[in-house]
From Swiss-Prot:
Record-linked HAMAP family: AnhMurNAc_kinase
Key words, A-Z: ATP-binding, Carbohydrate metabolism, Kinase, Nucleotide-binding, Transferase
InterPro entries: Anhydro_N_Ac-Mur_kinase, ATPase_NBD
Protein name: Anhydro-N-acetylmuramic acid kinase
Alphabetized NCBIfam families for the sequence: PRK09585.1-1, PRK09585.1-3, PRK09585.3-2
Organism: Shigella flexneri serotype 5b (strain 8401)
One Pfam family hit: AnmK
Documented EC number(s): 2.7.1.170
Annotated function: Catalyzes the specific phosphorylation of 1,6-anhydro-N-acetylmuramic acid (anhMurNAc) with the simultaneous cleavage of the 1,6-anhydro ring, generating MurNAc-6-P. Is required for the utilization of anhMurNAc either imported from the medium or derived from its own cell wall murein, and thus plays a role in cell wall recycling.
């Protein structure tokens, strides 16, 4: 069973940067050593957003984007290696999630697509890469997501305390760590995605820092109820979603019925949408004693305050409080999944994804020995 230093690379639906984490991993523990966030050029970010909202590309344009993202991920890894004074030979493997551009796990031909050519990463770093983590689970009838609950269970489950882990990235997802029950998990709906999209269009800001805009506005209750009527929110688990569904076009369709509203009121309503849809799912899943929050949304004071109010009796905290960086959680999870793949261990949980069986995940892109 291979153990040693692994690197995890994650570029999530928020597109707020490439998260890169260095960790030592073996069968007994995961210890984070270092991390960095690598910027995504505006042109690449916009190209990904365009695909996610259905804009057509030629095969040439798509291939170029795949290559450019692979090079970007390699640059991020090399920056971390340089910062830590490490060589390629010091790393067992890289676990790279890739950039999701489409996720459609139901229908006649279920599929998910993450791009960022792993061959580019191997060639530019000299390190073995494990990637393409989601499609095996989909091939076995699963959603291909979320995959992180298995990692949350390994690190954060408690023998007697009812715990849940909430990741608020572009999409919010919940891991159910309930003693005596199979691990559960699913996407609750939009996390930061709609809030970020709205303030970007209205004020040219990548996100609502400290929820300043949202706190200056008032929740538009009819708009909130209109958005809450979306069938995704009442759909039973297992379920997963992404930017191809909850995007700016989705928001525009709901806003057509509310012309002339104050942009700050819309921001406040979107924050409330995220808080309400999360809290409803926590309660529908039986509630918990402790909700541990990670991801960019854990730094949104309004979201955290609203969750505490909506979930009275639950201790709402961050994963940082238990010693795991909320910013690095997902990248760390894919380093761990790479370790499991190389060890020949399953990485999915059928109780979470709905797959017909446990399976080893991903494809291995070996470096030259």
């Amino acid at each position: 069973m291979k153990s040693g230093r692994f690197i995890g690379v994650m570029s999530g639906t928020s597109l707020d940067g490439v998260d890169v984490v260095l960790a030592t991993i073996d069968e007994h523990r995961v210890a984070q050593l270092a991390s960095l966030s690598w910027p995504i050029p505006v042109s690449l970010k916009q190209a990904v957003l365009d695909i996610c909202q259905g804009q057509q590309l030629t095969l040439s344009q798509f291939g170029q984007l795949d290559t450019q993202l692979g090079r970007l991920f390699a640059d991020a890894v090399n920056a971390l290696l340089k910062e830590q004074n490490l060589q390629a030979r010091d790393i067992v493997a890289i676990g790279c999630h890739g950039q999701t551009v489409w996720h459609e796990p139901t229908g006649v031909a279920p599929h998910t697509l993450q791009i960022g050519d792993n061959n580019q990463i191997v060639a530019r770093t000299g390190i073995t890469v494990v990637g393409d983590f989601r499609r095996r689970d989909i091939a076995l009838g699963g959603q291909g997501a979320p995959l992180v609950p298995a990692f949350h269970h390994a690190l954060l489950a408690h023998p007697t305390e009812r715990r849940m882990v909430l990741n608020i990235g572009g999409i919010a997802n919940l891991s159910l760590l309930i003693p005596g029950q199979p691990v559960g998990g699913y996407d609750t709906g939009p996390g930061n995605m709609l809030m970020d999209a709205w303030i970007w269009r209205q004020a040219g800001k990548p996100y609502d820092k400290d929820a300043e805009w949202a706190r200056a506005g008032k929740v538009i209750l009819p708009l909130l109820q209109n958005m809450l009527s979306d069938p995704y929110f009442s759909q039973p688990a297992p379920k997963s979603t992404g930017r191809e569904y909850f995007n700016y076009g989705w928001l525009e369709r709901h806003l057509r019925h509310f012309p002339g509203v104050d942009p700050r009121d819309v921001q406040a309503t979107l924050a409330e949408l995220t808080a309400v849809t999360i809290s409803e799912q926590v309660l529908l899943s039986g509630g918990c004693e402790r909700l541990m929050v990670c991801g960019g949304g854990s730094r949104n004071p309004l979201l955290m305050a609203r969750l505490a109010v909506l979930l009275l009796g639950t201790e709402v905290t961050t994963t940082d409080a238990v010693g795991i960086s909320g910013d690095d959680m997902e990248a760390l999870a894919f380093a761990w999944l790479a370790w499991r793949t190389l060890a020949g261990l399953p990485g999915n949980l059928p109780s979470v994804t709905g797959a017909s069986q446990e399976t080893v995940l991903g494809a291995i892109f070996p470096a030259n020995s």
